[in-house]
Amino acid sequence: MSRDNSNPKPLRPEIERMIRVDQAGEFGATRIYKGQLAVMGNRGPHSAEIAGMAEQEEGHRARFDAMMAERGVRPTALQPFWSIAGYALGAGTALLGPEAAMACTAAVEEEIDRHYSDQLDRLAETGYEPELTAMIEEFREDEREHRDAALAAGAERAPAYPVLSGLIRLGCRAAIKISERV
């Protein structure tokens, strides 16, 4: 039996995975910023900017929380782990200095941009899920602004930037894959 893949409708489990992983990502971002601000306080060179980004991520997370509740989507079982890991990543990069904190933001947001773009491509294949599509488009633009602001704030001047950025991006890709399923 062959299947027509010309305009495949995303199945409910696929949409639930999208919502689950996106909520987990936004939650993780809030924890990264909390960790950075715990180290930098409100006097660091980028503290106000980080606090603003954190507030935006809280808004994103709240909207995904609401969508999960509406649709009965379970959160990732790894949320407690992502809470600790995100906070540790934020605090650790802030301890390396303000440029490293910005490198963390740039790396994470680069991966989230790619991830959201992949999801939007999948949703565009079908035309289904206009509410989810609009949210992802809006949030992707915010994440791009965060990435660009981090780069403008000196992310690439962080110690061992290519290595730091590469490791963070690899960790993000792994977290995305795991959170889709678990």
Tell me the role of every PLM-derived stretch:
Residues 1-182:
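Non-heme di-metal
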